[in-house]
Amino acid sequence: MTNKAIYPGTFDPLTNGHLDLVTRAAKMFDVVVLAIAASPSKRPLFDLNERVALATQVTAHLPNVKVTGFSDLMADFARQQQANILIRGVRAMTDVDYEMPLAKMNRHLMPALETVFMLPAEAWSYISSTLVKEVALHGGDVDHFLPAPIAKEVRARLHP
């Protein structure tokens, strides 16, 4: 049986913390689908196609990672992808508190889908896309927190 994992998120923008998790997941699972949620209610900085293109660019070195956009219910998307693992990154207990009901609902909707919580590397344990965007918006240097091509696009978008 192939262990196919889905790592879903808005990834607006995809940070070095996200890249660390997907890189580590690629070593653990046969296939990892980096599933980028449309999330229009979050009013993303980059549209879905832009986020998919940027994520594809920075994960090109990972042959078993496939990047795709989605707007479905997670359990339905996992079924379509024939995935049996759902990866969720957790930085703190507040993330666990948020993720537990989602994991339980996904288990109810698709019992074969197992949720795996992964901790970020220490260097990335405090960053989030929202925090990085806020720093960038105010002219702060975000190069340390984002893959280079994404940092360049964030700067161009926020400070044309």
Swiss-Prot record:
This protein's assembly is summarised as: Homohexamer.
Question: Quick check: keyword Magnesium in the entry?
Answer: yes
Give the protein's recorded name.
Answer: Phosphopantetheine adenylyltransferase
The protein's UniProt keywords, in alphabetical order, are:
ATP-binding, Coenzyme A biosynthesis, Cytoplasm, Magnesium, Nucleotide-binding, Nucleotidyltransferase, Transferase
Q: List the disulfide bonds.
A: none
Belongs to which family? Belongs to the bacterial CoaD family.
Q: What class of enzyme is it?
A: transferase
This protein's pathway reads: Cofactor biosynthesis; coenzyme A biosynthesis; CoA from (R)-pantothenate: step 4/5
* Site keyed Transition state stabilizer: positions: H18
- The yes or no answer to whether the keyword Zinc is present is no
Tell me where in or outside the cell this protein is found. Answer: Cytoplasm
Q: What biological function has been recorded for the protein in this entry? A: Reversibly transfers an adenylyl group from ATP to 4'-phosphopantetheine, yielding dephospho-CoA (dPCoA) and pyrophosphate.
Q: Where does substrate bind?
A: T10, K42, M74, R88
Biological process annotations from GO:
coenzyme A biosynthetic process
**CDD domains to which the protein is assigned, alphabetical:** PPAT
State the needed cofactors, names only.
Mg(2+)
Q: Which residues form the signal peptide?
A: none
Q: Where does ATP bind?
A: T10, F11, H18, G89, V90, R91, E99, W124, S125, Y126, I127, S128, S129, T130
* Gene Ontology cellular component list: cytoplasm
Q: Which reaction does it catalyse?
A: (R)-4'-phosphopantetheine + ATP + H(+) = 3'-dephospho-CoA + diphosphate
Q: What is its EC number?
A: 2.7.7.3
Lineage, please? Bacteria, Pseudomonadati, Pseudomonadota, Gammaproteobacteria, Enterobacterales
